[in-house]
């Protein structure tokens, strides 16, 4: 617990410009390893590892101590809420509050409701998110919610391209040229290859696309990415060591579309399924949650600007060349052009 408090102190010292303010903020943090404050809390956030059984076991110990009206929130990044809530005495109090790393810098929080979440719990979760100066994105319970659901095909496609012999640095360079803050290979290393593999397998099981199994040997060897110093790249002093992009071996001419349209097509699936309420929220969520090239307006705005018919035709061409994972989502048939709802 002390290392966490030390990090908080360093953060407050760096951000506070008012004398004494950092000490005041730090004093409001209470280390509570034994959970003695649970019975007084308005919001209790669970953030243990992604295992449904472990989460349910924790809830069984915590829920009896919650006061009336308190909400129980999970920081799950990919698990549906319904199985997590099934053994709760009051399943309607469970919500999802999915923060993104680094939490201090990422403004977005996915606020997830299940089929049984009570309106009061949903409203309280949204209000709490705003109160801590975050941007709440309402989502329906579904594997991966919005951001991870859209990101995973992008990162998996990058790994498939790498398996075909495309250099890692070339893959990242193509994404950065499009406008992404970093490439999918570097992003996977930062997220953690163990996390990518776990989430990717959950989404593959749910939706049938490929999983990023190519990284399994690295995970088994403890090469997890930035946090272990070695992953797809070697990491030194917090930075990826990338070989120079070789001009003599240019990227495949369809690589940009393979990466970006994988995201775009998945964003359409999220819209069609009603996981997020409208296209504008999806675009905002993907920009703030993943860093999708902001000047392009988000994946669905990008599709509108490029032309829905053009995007669908490119997806069909990619499906013919690379497989059914690129088959255009049925939602494109009712998706309008610029200015359409």
Label every model-predicted segment.
Residues 1-341:
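N-terminal glycine-rich phosphate-binding loop for ADP-containing cofactors
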């Amino acid at each position: 617990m002390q290392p966490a408090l030390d990090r908080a102190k360093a953060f407050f010292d760096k951000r506070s410009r008012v004398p004494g303010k950092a000490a005041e903020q730090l004093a409001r943090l209470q280390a509570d390893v034994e959970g003695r404050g649970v019975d007084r809390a308005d919001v209790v956030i669970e953030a243990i590892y992604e295992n449904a059984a472990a989460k349910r076991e924790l809830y069984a110990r915590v829920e009896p101590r919650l006061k009336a009206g308190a909400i129980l929130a999970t920081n799950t990044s990919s698990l549906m809420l319904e199985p997590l809530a099934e053994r709760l005495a009051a399943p309607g109090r469970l919500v999802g509050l999915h923060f993104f790393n680094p939490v201090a810098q990422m403004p977005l929080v996915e606020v997830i409701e299940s089929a049984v979440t009570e309106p009061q719990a949903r409203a309280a979760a949204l209000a709490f998110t705003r109160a801590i100066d975050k941007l709440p994105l309402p989502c329906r319970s579904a594997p991966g919610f919005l951001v991870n659901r859209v990101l995973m095909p992008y990162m998996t496609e990058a790994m498939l391209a790498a398996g075909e012999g495309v250099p890692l640095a070339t893959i990242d360079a193509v994404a950065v040229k499009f406008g992404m803050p970093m490439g999918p290979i570097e992003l996977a290393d930062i997220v953690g290859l163990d996390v990518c593999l776990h989430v990717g397998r959950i989404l593959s099981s749910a939706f049938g696309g490929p999983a990023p199994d190519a990284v399994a040997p690295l995970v088994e060897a403890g090469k997890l990415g930035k946090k272990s110093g070695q992953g797809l790249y070697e990491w030194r002093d917090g930075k990826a060591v990338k070989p120079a992009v070789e001009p003599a071996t240019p990227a495949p001419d369809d690589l940009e579309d393979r990466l970006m349209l994988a995201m775009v097509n998945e964003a359409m699936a999220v819209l069609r399924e009603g996981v997020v309420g409208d296209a504008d929220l999806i675009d905002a969520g993907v920009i703030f949650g993943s860093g999708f090239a902001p000047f392009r307006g988000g994946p669905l705005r990008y599709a509108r600007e490029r032309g829905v018919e053009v995007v669908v035709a490119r997806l069909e061409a990619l499906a013919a060349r690379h497989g059914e994972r690129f088959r255009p989502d049925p939602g494109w048939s009712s998706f309008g052009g610029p200015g359409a709802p």
